Regions:
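Alpha/beta enzyme core
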Residues: 192-316, 321-335, 353
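Glycine-rich beta-to-alpha transition loops that act as phosphate-gripper elements at the mouths
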Residues: 158-160, 281-288, 334-347
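Conserved, mostly hydrophobic/aromatic
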Residues: 69, 126, 147, 205, ...
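Hydrophobic faces of well-ordered beta-strands that scaffold small-molecule active sites
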Residues: 124-127, 154-156, 175-177, 203, ...
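N-terminal secretory signal peptides and thylakoid transit peptides that target proteins
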Residues: 2-20
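Glycine-rich active-site/cofactor-binding loop and its immediate structural neighborhood
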Residues: 120-157
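An N-cap/entry alpha-helix motif that binds or orients negatively charged groups
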Residues: 44-117, 215, 224-264, 400-402, ...
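C-terminal helical cap(s) of enzyme catalytic domains, especially alpha/beta-barrels
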Residues: 324, 369-387
């Protein structure tokens, strides 16, 4: 949109906002005022050419959009079906209000958190996302270097475009490994032995996407990229053949195996629990019933997740599901959450509802796609800074002090 068009639109909205006729209708006036604010934000947010110019994580979105190939961009931003769950994830934050306590010392706000015995500089972690080289040539290594600089936990996807060994070296400590369980137990063992040998002690079994998905936007846009990056799109979506060239499948016997086992059940979880000697998290649960089963089956943690709205069109936000999962485990195991987090205040709300740590996905991919390591680093800097502001303004000096008393929630009971 040209500068002259933006200016004309701004002046028209200002004219409407000042009109006594519009003012007579409160709803219309509010709508027009929102338009003025949105227009001002759009003008202020010219596409950034330097990550240092970013004020919020949203500033990276258009910058990344202009650099990332169309099919890869569609893969990053789209959900499933009508993308309703993506919208639900964001809309939930507007339903949770902060309840600040005043007259409290905010000179020393500590956002550090300990997760399974390791201290991180904040409760914000980087979610597993597959094939990060599709967004920037340095891919997972750029993300790892930024995570190291910011003292941040990094998950690594089974669908990574960089090996776990390389990422661990760049990060300076082991990642938490997100595990897509193949339909062959032998393949599971081979992959997990490699992960263990690389020094990883935490595995997150993903359970919310075992039968595939309908990603409409991605599927319609992907053919535009085939001439430019055919290596990224081998085989049919979801088939094991699509992933055999990825690093974590090298040396793994996937003959006749599916990338994810559609027959996976709690008996499989028990078998995995007996085999894996480290910490085992289940990623993708969002009900109290499944949370209680985690306790029965010896699981060490739960990641409340709907795959960023990319698995099942539940139309239910992870922030809404979080309280019932937290209540079900009653402090016996930690609960983590991801899905739609864009602000430090969003993170604060999840911590108040009982999350131990909070994951981000698309925001750091925007940073990666726009500026590589520097973009990811700035995204983390912004969110950590916003979290400090939210904590200080609400009267909390440490993450441990953030409780349900600091938020007001709607009736989300089932």
């Amino acid at each position: 949109m040209s500068h002259s068009t933006l200016t004309a639109r701004r002046e028209f909205l200002k004219f409407l906002a000042a009109s006594p006729y519009v003012a007579a209708f409160g709803g219309v006036a509010a709508f027009v005022q929102e338009g003025v604010l949105a227009q001002g934000a759009q003008e202020a947010a010219d596409v950034i050419a330097d990550p240092a110019r970013a004020i919020t994580v949203f500033d990276f979105e258009e910058a990344a959009h202009r650099k990332v190939l169309p099919g890869h961009w569609a893969y990053m931003v789209s959900g499933v079906d009508d993308d309703g769950t993506i919208r639900a994830n964001r809309e939930a934050f507007r339903q949770v209000q902060l309840r600040p306590r005043r007259l409290r010392d905010a000179t020393k706000v500590d956002i550090r958190v300990e997760l399974f015995g390791t201290t991180y500089n904040s409760p914000i972690f980087l979610c597993p996302t597959g094939g990060e080289k599709g967004f920037h040539p340095d891919g997972e290594l750029a993300v790892a270097r930024a995570a190291k600089a910011r003292g941040t936990l990094q998950f690594l996807s089974t669908s990574t475009s960089t090996s776990v060994e390389e990422v661990n070296r760049a990060l300076g400590r082991p990642v938490w490994y997100q595990f897509y369980a193949p339909s062959s137990w032998g393949a599971c063992e081979q992959m997990l032995r490699r992960v263990e040998a690389a020094g990883c002690s935490v595995v997150a079994l993903t359970v919310d996407n075992t039968t595939g998905r309908l990603s409409e936007t991605y599927l319609r846009t992907r053919p535009k990229d085939l001439q430019q990056c055919a290596a990224c799109h081998q085989g049919e979506p979801g088939a094991a053949s699509s992933y055999l060239t990825r690093p974590m499948y090298q040396g793994v016997n996937m003959a006749g195996a599916l990338r994810q086992d559609p027959a996976m059940d709690w008996a499989f979880v028990d078998r995995l629990r007996r085999f894996w000697r480290g910490k085992l998290i289940i990623k993708g649960l969002d009900t109290r019933e499944d949370a209680r089963l985690c306790l029965e089956h010896g699981i060490d943690g739960i990641l409340v997740s709907n795959h960023g709205g990319r698995a099942t069109e539940t139309l239910r936000a992870t922030l809404e599901a979080l309280p019932e999962v937290v209540a079900a485990v009653n402090g016996r195991i930690p609960v983590y959450v991801d899905g739609g987090f864009r602000r430090g205040a969003d993170v604060f709300k999840a911590l108040a509802l009982g999350a131990k740590a909070v994951g981000i996905g698309r925001p750091f991919l925007w940073g990666l796609g726009a500026f590589g390591q520097a973009g990811v680093d700035r995204v983390l800097e912004i969110l950590q800074g916003e979290l400090r502001l939210a904590m200080g303004n609400c009267g909390t000096q440490s993450v441990a002090e953030i409780t349900h008393a600091y938020v007001a929630t709607p009736n989300w009971k089932i």
